[in-house]
Design a protein with these regions (language model features):
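RNA pseudouridine synthases
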Residues: 1-167
Length: 167
């Protein structure tokens, strides 16, 4: 893998990680049960090296907005790593984030979560930036992308939900 390529993503994940910043250094490889899924191999003897650095940007009680920087670029790396640490990506059907993972399962809250799934009917993962050194000019090139409307809409709803509840 090429360390000169800088990849940053933003993700909505279930729950709040124990640490505000962290590094997940766990090998990843195809699942033995379903080849479409990537599994984390904690013993690091199977799969390929995969390193994800993350930091929490904001917390909304049951979900968090994080930024991830990839040191390696494995298939489904962020999705598999977040599932491995118990914080699957919001509305990620493949890796278990498409149901109420954190919080109670009672009617009003469950409806609130399901409405957010409808507002953003995809996983809560966004490619924020891609940077590299141009091969002929040797200049650093950086492409950035703002969070899309559906993603921002879900964040806004969680902020409002957060302030409307007394914990």
């Amino acid at each position: 893998y090429d360390h000169t390529i800088e990849r940053k993503y933003q993700a909505l994940i279930w729950g709040i990680p124990n640490k505000e910043k962290g590094t997940i250094n766990i090998n990843l490889g195809r699942s033995f049960k379903d080849r479409r899924i990537i599994d984390a191999f904690a013993n690091n003897t199977l799969g390929k090296k995969a390193i994800t650095h993350y930091k929490v940007i904001e917390q909304y009680h049951y979900i968090s907005l994080i930024e991830c920087e990839l040191e390696t670029g494995r298939t489904h790396q962020i999705r598999a790593h977040m599932k491995y640490i118990g914080h699957p990506i919001f509305n990620d059907k493949t890796y278990g984030g498409d149901k109420v993972v954190k919080g109670n399962k009672f009617t009003n809250y469950k409806k609130f979560v399901e409405n957010n799934f409808k507002l953003m009917p995809r996983q809560g993962l966004h490619a924020k930036s891609l940077g590299f050194v141009h091969p002929t000019t040797n200049q650093k090139v950086l492409f950035e992308s703002e969070l899309p409307e559906d993603f921002l809409g879900v964040i806004d709803r969680w902020k409002k939900y957060n302030t409307s509840k007394n914990y």
